[in-house]
Amino acid sequence: MRVAYASFTECGRRSENQDYLRVLELDKNRFLFVLADGMGGHHDGACSSRIVCNAFCEYWLKHIENGIHEDFISEAALQAFNKLKRQADRKKGVKMGTTIVGAYMDGCRVHIFHCGDSRCYLFRNPKGCIFQTCDHVDFSLT
């Protein structure tokens, strides 16, 4: 199977782009795409997104050969966010935060994951968008 992909980020209304993207090409049929977006109102969102994205990918590379099981993606995210918490604690407890969204392609199977309000969309020609994740944010609280 041939896979082609592209990426694009934009800072939107903010002065700084706090997005961080990683793509792991594990072999010709397995790809991991991860995007983290630093949370507005928190300290150093660009650093937060970089830490979480890299820690998630590090966990993935270290453990993927054991195969994907039910809690694999959750454990990768937990390890990544724990690393971010340790960094925040070293900075005397400043609030650091980021969203994360991604997809793991294994042949014809795709696993989608996300936490926060970063979305993943699935487009299929000629139908257009056929799937969209739901945000994990209650906007009535903001």
Feature map (PLM): residue ranges:
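PP2C/PPM-type serine/threonine phosphatase catalytic domain
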Residues: 1-142
